[in-house]
Curated annotation (Swiss-Prot):
Entries under SMART domains matching the protein: LRR_BAC, LRR_SD22, LRR_TYP, S_TKc
Name of this chain's protein: Probable serine/threonine-protein kinase DDB_G0278509
LRR repeats: 386-407, 411-432, 435-457, 458-480, 481-502, 503-524, 527-548, 572-593, 595-616, 619-641, 642-663, 665-687, 688-708
Positions of the catalytic residues: 1069
């Protein structure tokens, strides 16, 4: 019987228009000049010459069996089909699909519709409803053929399928005989221009055009024999007595003899009740005796179609074409029976039993058969096109499909079995697919590869990645045509035997357990261009292993030297990646790689770049040496004349050689996180430099030659002792370099912000430049009584260091107003104000007398007040002091004239200023000042606008409610103010939240407020809850592997975004309860109660409740020398430790936090590893264990057990995140890239 060989995926024809739907019909616009523009696997239709052609005829023909190979033309469709199954029969293959029809080609010939010659005769009447019906064509017959009665019918049942099966079984020898006979036919057919014969659409309407027939002759395919069975609307009655043919007709030859069978009703099997037409044509060159045979000797075409096309012209021209038929039938084809089984009911096939095979008994006819082109044609499927690919991916197959008949599958060049569950391959699986060129089987569960793979002599691409292979058979090395071999993400411990793989150009072996590379395995790879050995366990690459390699990747191999002299033989190497290998030094043999274009040796332990190596790499365009221990770049770096990009970040470089300035093609230079104190004086020679990154160094000034770097567009200077406004960009930097005195009169468009919280930390006087500065005190923690008590505090010494540098221009100062939240500032210790402050161009400046009053600290002066208006402020109290805003407009204006004599010339200068509308007392006494009006912060929300709903979460110090604010669903976090520390924690959390920029993986923050003895933080509301709930509540949805990887990517992206702030933000409380799930199944990071800025005075909290997502008390942190932050709780002994009562966070915390040491981004990375473990296992970390015990386990290096069946990529990431030393852990950016590559391998199929 037949065998199921898999599910089918198919699509649109390449190069043809998709069918369009008009008025309920599907129109085929590819049919031109009577031909359907389908292209076969190796052939197609040539519109210009009206002929068919074969591309690679040698590959189409089987010279041993004298037959043409078979092709299944399936492509992807825009229709969503389901449960379709491909069956393997005896001589013919056929497809049973519930929603769609297919075509099978036994010849590889172009699949033209064999019924109609003209486009106007070829139409489709039945529409495709809801993607559930088969559709096709019916022949248009003339009056002699009689009309076909259309009767309502019913679909096939199981008995009918058995009858169809029996028919093919009983006639398989006839099908084979026909195929062989047709292959021996060599004919030239001429068609009369007035003829409407439809002999398989191979005869041209033009008498002079024989191209089509000539091509058929070349391919040994005649164009006559045809048996058509229309089954799309097949109706079968279970009552055997009623299963009869309702209509027959016979067209005879020139003798005009009508067969008596026209009037008879013939049974087809015992189960068919349909309208059938049997057309028999008589050939004058054959005797009538040949027609007394009940067997059909030549059956070349089976057409399962709809009943919508009428074969109006087929019978009119029988006599006209008998001569043609005689000329074409040189192989004694005796009978042609054209059987049409037509009804109206669509076939609905959802069965799981053996395929339907038509059973029929055909009456003998006293006529001869005309031949048609030999191929099996299963309904007119617009979406089929010539394809060499069989796509059986994502079908949940557990076994490798068996292809029994070589003729059926020999034409396939590509078989895709990816994303199934195939565990093994039978030894004889490749016997009948020896012509296969590409076998794609990634993402299965294969444990081995059979030795019979050597039968695939023509294989060029083999993808067995993401399986469970432990070893590769030696026979694979006999695939001499193999060009690409993918074996990544397996469990290979040995390098595969390469044998005769002389044409191999790409070998991918990443994410395995390979420890050594034997020379004999690499020597045959003379054409190798790409070798990926990343994420293996190679200790030392054996010398002299490879030659003529273009790309080599050996990431994470712990090579400890990188293979020594092997690079000496890799003279054609263009790209070399040795990153993540813990290399102690660069092999000197790298100097032989004179053709190298890209070299990556980042994330190692290299301290020196050898001059000899660098000097020899003159063609190098990209050099990445970041995250090493390099102290100095070699002087020979100027030999890298082709260098475009240099990344030397995260080293300990203290000095750049002057020779670096001669890299004339350099465009990107990254020197972040080093110990540089200055740049070379000739840095301006880098005229093509576009991007310069200098973050976190010790550079105090830029050389004047920097102005020559006119191509530069991006520059990063944060974390250096440079003027604070350098972050404004290249314009401000260039201006400052040109004008050391920094007269910013021309920089009115720049509006730097002075954070008043930093004023107390200044060790040197700050300079207040004019031109639109304003003071931002939103983060200020000092002088809070000004904002809260309603009274001015006594003047302090906190601002005694403020200086106003001469000269200072403060013209045009309406750009930014004074922030009303700023505290009061004392002026009694201000140095004398320079005369240059008197500005003639400043209409809002003070008069000389007013300034003198300020200098002498008189009790009453007049000054501008840009913070308030005259109508909103109390008439007799000070609301704020502005020294640069001058935003209020006085009702009166005073004009003064100043006369100056210079070089004997008298110059007159006129100045205008606005007078102060009110006076205030600047003495230290506050007795006359009443309570100030309440100041509202920019982040503050009106409590009355909040509407509370139900409680959705509760912790030790806070509760979370669902509510509404300004018509938005929001989450409201309520924090009880138990003491001043609680208020400090609240202000710090709000300060961080207000700095966050919108990001898809961070919970949106709306604002906060204080009411009574509570503080409230308003954020986005996500009704799905936390990832913890999604993982551990049984009633919720079950997450598949792909979704879990997607969650991990979201968390990594969100954390990476936090690390990009300057200074970086550390969450320090990453856990699944603080990861909220959106309706689109994305993750957003929430709860910044423990979050901290790096390199600032920070507070952090160790939560004492494992069930809370909220804020607790905190411990103060201070900056450490290396930029990480140390948790400091001083106990009675003066030592630093973590509050031992708050250890719930220990379940996710990094060891350095538990050891009371510094924390950094890498601390969050450790927590991310635990989250990833929780995603993989669906278990709660350290569930039921005592926090103290967990703490000791983590500090001692013990970790949670990773399941054996865990994906290798995720396993490696988890292990890397759990490294005991924080510097050994990856960054979130590298984690994201690794996860993204894993996601691509899951969701995106490789197309070659």
């Amino acid at each position: 019987m037949s065998k199921v060989i898999g599910y089918i995926d198919y699509g649109d024809p390449d190069g043809n228009e998709e069918p369009s739907k008009q008025n309920g019909e599907y129109i085929d616009y590819s049919n031109e000049n009577g031909y359907n523009a389908y292209h076969s696997v190796n052939g197609g239709y040539d519109k210009d010459n009206n002929n068919h052609h074969h591309h690679n005829q040698e590959e189409d023909y089987d010279y041993d069996n004298n037959t043409h190979v078979n092709y299944l033309t399936t492509k992807h469709s825009q229709f969503q089909l389901s449960r379709g199954r491909l069956y393997q029969g005896h001589q013919s293959s056929h497809i049973i699909y519930p929603h769609q029809s297919y075509k099978l080609s036994n010849s590889g010939e172009s699949m033209n519709r064999s019924i109609n010659q003209s486009k106007e005769e070829d139409h489709l009447e039945n529409s495709l409803h809801d993607d559930e019906y088969l559709y096709g064509y019916e022949d248009h017959h003339d009056d002699q053929a009689s009309s076909i009665s259309q009767e309502s019918s019913q679909g096939l049942d199981e008995t009918d399928f058995d009858n169809i099966d029996k028919y093919f079984e009983s006639n398989q020898h006839l099908l084979l005989q026909t195929l062989q006979n047709n292959n021996n036919n060599n004919s030239n057919s001429n068609s009369n221009s007035n003829s409407n014969s439809n002999n398989n659409n191979n005869n041209n309407n033009n008498n002079n055009n024989n191209n089509n027939n000539n091509n058929n002759t070349k391919n040994n395919i005649t164009d006559e024999n045809q048996l058509e069975i229309h089954l799309n609307d097949l109706s079968i009655d279970s009552d055997n007595s009623n299963n009869k043919i309702n209509k027959q007709y016979v067209n005879s030859d020139n003798s005009n003899n009508n067969n008596s069978n026209n009037s008879n009703n013939n049974n087809i099997g015992s189960n068919i009740n349909s309208n059938c037409n049997i057309e028999n044509e008589k050939n004058s060159n054959n005797t009538d005796d040949n027609n007394n045979n009940n067997n059909i000797e030549n059956v070349n075409k089976i057409n399962i179609e709809d009943n919508n096309n009428n074969n109006n012209n087929n019978n009119n021209n029988n006599n006209n074409n008998n001569n043609n038929n005689n000329n074409n039938n040189n192989n004694n084809n005796n009978n042609n029976n054209k059987i049409e089984v037509i009804s109206n009911k669509p076939i609905q096939l959802f069965s799981d039993y053996d395929p339907p095979i038509l059973t029929t008994s055909t009456s003998t006819s006293q006529s001869k058969i005309k031949t048609q082109q030999p191929f099996l044609f299963f309904s007119s499927n617009y979406l089929n096109s010539s394809s060499t690919e069989l796509d059986l991916s994502e079908q949940e197959l557990n076994e490798f499909p068996i292809f029994d008949e070589k003729e059926i599958v020999q034409g396939y060049k590509i078989i895709d079995l990816s994303f199934n569950n195939i565990k093994s391959i039978p030894l004889d699986a490749f016997t009948n697919i020896s012509n296969l060129e590409q076998l794609i089987m990634f993402n299965n569960n294969l444990s081995d590869v059979p030795s019979s793979i050597e039968f695939l002599k023509h294989l060029t691409i083999l993808d067995l990645s993401h399986n469970n292979l432990h070893e590769i058979c030696r026979e694979l090395g006999n695939l001499s045509f193999l060009r690409e071999l993918y074996l990544s993400n397996n469990s290979l411990k040995k390098f595969p035997t390469t044998g005769n793989l002389y044409n191999l150009k790409k070998l991918i072996l990443d994410n395995n357990q390979i420890t050594t590379i034997p020379i004999e395995c690499v020597e045959p790879l003379i054409q190798l261009q790409t070798l990926d050995l990343s994420f293996n366990k190679i200790g030392t690459i054996t010398s002299s292993t490879t030659t003529t390699t273009t790309t080599t990747t050996t990431n994470n191999n712990n090579n400890n030297g990188g293979g020594g002299s092997i690079y000496q033989k890799m003279k054609n190497l263009k790209q070399l990646n040795l990153s993540h290998n813990e290399l102690q030094e660069i092999p000197s043999s790298l100097r032989h790689l004179s053709k190298l274009h890209s070299l990556s040796i980042d994330y190692n332990q290299i301290s020196v770049l050898p001059d000899k190596v660098v000097a020899s790499l003159s063609r190098l365009a990209k050099l990445t040496i970041s995250n090493n221990k390099i102290k100095q770049l070699p002087f020979a770096i100027n030999n890298l004349s082709s260098l475009i990009e240099l990344n030397a970040s995260n080293n300990v470089i203290e000095l750049l050689p002057d020779s670096i300035c001669y890299l004339s093609n350099l465009k990107k230079l990254n020197l972040n996180n080093n110990n540089l104190k200055e740049l070379p004086s000739n840095i301006g020679f880098l005229t093509k430099l576009v991007d310069l990154q200098l973050y976190n160094n010790q550079i105090s000034s830029l050389p004047i030659s920097f102005l020559k770097c006119r191509s530069i567009r991006e520059i990063g200077t944060d974390g250096n002792p440079l003027p604070s406004y350098y972050h404004l960009g290249i314009k401000a930097i260039r201006y400052h370099i040109k004008n050391p005195d920094c007269d910013l009169d021309d920089l009115n468009s720049i509006s730097p912000t002075i954070d008043s919280s930093t004023i107390e930390q200044q060790q040197q006087p700050i300079q207040l430049f004019g031109g639109g500065n304003y003071i931002d005190s939103s983060n200020n923690n000092g002088n809070e009584s000004f904002c809260n008590s309603g009274e001015l505090s006594p003047l302090t010494d906190s601002l005694e260091c403020i200086e106003m540098p001469p000269p200072m221009q403060i013209s045009e100062n309406l750009r930014k107003p004074l922030n009303v939240n700023s505290p009061s500032y004392p002026f009694q210790k201000l140095d004398p104000i320079p005369q240059s402050l008197y500005s003639s161009s400043n209409p809002r400046s003070h008069t000389e007398s007013d300034i003198q009053k300020l200098k002498n600290n008189d009790e009453t002066i007049t000054t501008t007040n840009s913070s308030i208006s005259t109508t909103s402020s109390p008439p007799s109290l000070l609301f704020g002091v502005s020294i640069n805003g001058n935003g209020i407009i006085s009702t009166t204006t005073t004009t003064t004239t100043t006369t100056t004599t210079t070089n004997g010339k008298t110059l007159s200068r006129q100045s205008s200023f606005q007078q102060i509308p009110q006076q205030f007392n600047l003495s230290t006494s506050t007795t006359n000042i009443t309570k100030l009006p309440r100041i509202k912060y920019t982040w503050e929300i009106d409590f009355d606008e909040i509407q509370f709903f139900n409680l959705i979460g509760q912790g030790g110090f806070s509760k979370v409610y669902h509510g509404v604010w300004r018509s938005k669903d929001v989450a409201i976090k309520q924090i009880e103010l138990q003491n001043n520390k609680s208020l400090d924690d609240f202000r710090r959390e709000v300060g961080i939240l207000s700095k966050l920029k919108p990001h898809e993986n961070l919970l949106a923050y709306y604002g906060a407020c204080k009411h009574a003895n509570y503080c409230y933080i308003i954020t986005e509301y996500l009704p799905r809850g936390s990832l913890h709930d999604l993982l551990h509540r049984e009633q919720l949805m079950k997450l598949d592997f792909k979704q879990k990887v997607s969650f991990a990517i979201c968390v990594a992206l969100g954390c990476y975004h936090l690390s990009t702030y300057e200074p970086p933000i550390y969450h320090t409380d990453l856990k699944t309860k603080n990861l909220l799930v959106t309706n689109a199944l994305k993750i957003k990071i929430a709860d910044f109660g423990l979050a901290s800025f790096a390199k600032k005075s920070l507070t952090t909290i160790i939560n004492n409740n494992n069930n809370t997502n909220n804020t607790a008390t905190s411990s103060t942190t201070t900056s450490s020398a290396n930029g990480a932050n140390s948790i400091s709780n001083n106990n009675n002994n003066g030592t630093t430790s973590v509050d031992q009562s708050r250890l719930a966070y220990a379940f996710y915390a990094a060891p350095e936090i538990l050891n009371s040491k510094h924390f950094s981004e890498k601390s969050d990375v450790f927590s991310f590893g635990t989250i990833l473990w929780e995603l993989v296992t669906n278990k709660i970390p350290f569930d039921g264990m005592d926090p103290y015990e967990v703490k000791e386990l983590l500090k001692s290096g013990k970790r949670l057990e990773i399941p054996e069946n865990c994906n290798e990529v995720l396993k490696n990431i988890i292990q890397d995140c759990w490294n005991q030393q924080s510097e050994d852990r990856p960054t979130f950016l590298s984690i994201y890239h690794r996860l993204e590559n894993l996601m691509k391998s899951i969701t995106k199929k490789r197309r070659f």
